[in-house]
Design a protein with these regions (language model features):
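Conserved functional hotspots at enzyme active or ligand-binding sites that engage polyanionic ligands
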Residues: 1-104
C-alpha cells in the first residue's frame, strides 16, 4: 500500500467522490485517516474552500466540504492516490476545521 500523507487526494472504494486527507502523518501511519470530501458541485465559501489538486502534469480546481469530516480505515478499503494539494492550501483547510470545532 502506498504511504498516505496529509494533503493527498484519494479515490476510496465504496465512496462516490474523492477525499482530501486532513489528518497528520503520525495518525496516517496506522493507515487510518480523517478526510473531507472533494466535491465539484459546491460554490466556494467560508467552509468550502477552493483548492487546486495537482495530478501529475495537470491541475484541477474544486471545493472541499469541511463540515463533512469522516474517519476511514484504509486497511479495510482499496484506494488510489489521485493527487495532492500544496502546503498553503492544506493550512487553509486545517484553519477552517479548527474554526468549526472551536469551543465558544
Amino acid at each position: 500500500m502506498e504511504k498516505v500523507l496529509q494533503g493527498d487526494v484519494l479515490r476510496v472504494g465504496g465512496i462516490a467522490h474523492p477525499v482530501l486527507v486532513v489528518s497528520n502523518q503520525e495518525f496516517n501511519q496506522i493507515m487510518e485517516v480523517i478526510v473531507c470530501p472533494v466535491l465539484d458541485d459546491l460554490s466556494p465559501n467560508a467552509i468550502h474552500p477552493m483548492i487546486t489538486v495537482r495530478q501529475q502534469n495537470t491541475e484541477k480546481k474544486t471545493c472541499i466540504a469541511c463540515e463533512h469530516l469522516r474517519h476511514l480505515d484504509l486497511k479495510a478499503r482499496k484506494y488510489t492516490k489521485l493527487g495532492s494539494v500544496n502546503y498553503s492550501q492544506m493550512m487553509d483547510v486545517c484553519d477552517i476545521l479548527i474554526a468549526l470545532l472551536e469551543y465558544r
